[in-house]
Amino acid sequence: EAWAELNIDLLPGRKIVSVDPAAHEARCEDGERITYGKMIWAAGGAPRRLPAPGGDLAGIHVIRTRADVDAIRAGLDSAGNIVIIGGGYIGLEAASVLVGMGKRVVVLEAQERLLARVAGPALSAFYEKEHRRRGVDIRLGAKIEAIIEKGGRPAGVRLAGGADLPADLVIVGIGIAPEVEPLIAAGAEEAR
């Protein structure tokens, strides 16, 4: 009702696949065309993939949806060593849950502190201390060289410098990439 009072049509659950700014028209995935005066593009995003050799192997997990969590859960019985790449909120939450289940968990963070892009040093230090206290092995300033593959699945993570970490399960939590392809195709400029 509040949206209607502001003369705004909210259309949740519709996927826009193309935009024609000159015609003030957007085309939905099902072919429906929607005309607009002004449009707000709330694009959402997809998990960033690991840009390292082996980063696209089956069995490299991300956490974005319930289905992602279910896929991780399905592999937990046979996973003793879990490597989480990314020391943001997603990676730390996963580490907390998994170490609580008795798993050996290593968190690899490229920055020199956890949560570096979203929190100040004091909060980063607090999360690091609490996770270490619970048994999470945290490696800061970690650079991933490759995912070690065995039988088409991840078997470990190789760090720059040559150290290998065993991994029965790898979770990547390194942010999201906005889904802006239809806007770029319509002529919008992508900020870099």
Residue locations for each model-derived region?
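Glycine-rich Rossmann-fold phosphate-binding loop(s) that bind the pyrophosphate
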Residues: R64-T65, I85-I90
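Glycine-rich loop(s) and the adjacent beta-strand/alpha-helix scaffold that form part
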Residues: A185-R192
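FAD-binding core/adjacent interface of flavoenzyme oxidoreductases
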Residues: W3-N81, R158-D164, L169-I174, P178, ...
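Rossmann-like dinucleotide-binding cores of NAD(P)H-dependent redox enzymes
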Residues: N81, I90-A146
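Active-site loop signature of alpha/beta-hydrolase-fold enzymes
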Residues: R48, R113, A146-I147, E179
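A conserved short coil-to-beta-strand element within the FAD-binding core of flavoproteins
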Residues: P12-H24, L140-R153
